[in-house]
Amino acid sequence: NEYVDKSGLNICNILDQKIMDNPRVYSKYLAQPNIDAIFYTGYGEKGDGRIKFSDNGKPVIEQRSVLWEGIDGGSNRGEESTVISQINSRSANPHSADGYTFVFVHCWTKNQQSIKTVIDGLNDNVRVVPVDQFVQLVKQNLGPK
């Protein structure tokens, strides 16, 4: 918690496996006063984009799409066109977890141009926001009342 405070960062990313159904893992992080949210990337997992809340109302947000060349050994799952299609086909309802997409970008196989290609291909009803605003919207629209 002290190092999180010193860094000025209050959102963490956890790279692990199968923690969305194990609150004992993420609740320890979210119990820290200087951590506001967790983005969860399941290594090798497809990711369902689930959003859960700890007992103190802080969210853990699972990846829904990946921008990662060769993620499935030859499938197109991590390619720009696939991610664009996935996002454009989903709900854009901010009051449903289905309306939010956390895209994990693999920095060794994709770059800023890949991200720009995805953004440029999104429908007009899709908003791309910085991570802190994403968390704020999730808390505001989906969090415990």
Language model: regions and residue ranges:
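Catalytic domains of cell-wall/extracellular-matrix polysaccharide-remodeling enzymes
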Residues: N1-G74, S114
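Binuclear metal-dependent hydrolase catalytic cores centered on His/Asp/Glu-rich metal-binding motifs
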Residues: G73-S81
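C-terminal domain-boundary segment and adjacent tail
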Residues: V4-L15, S27-N34, D48-R50, E80-K145
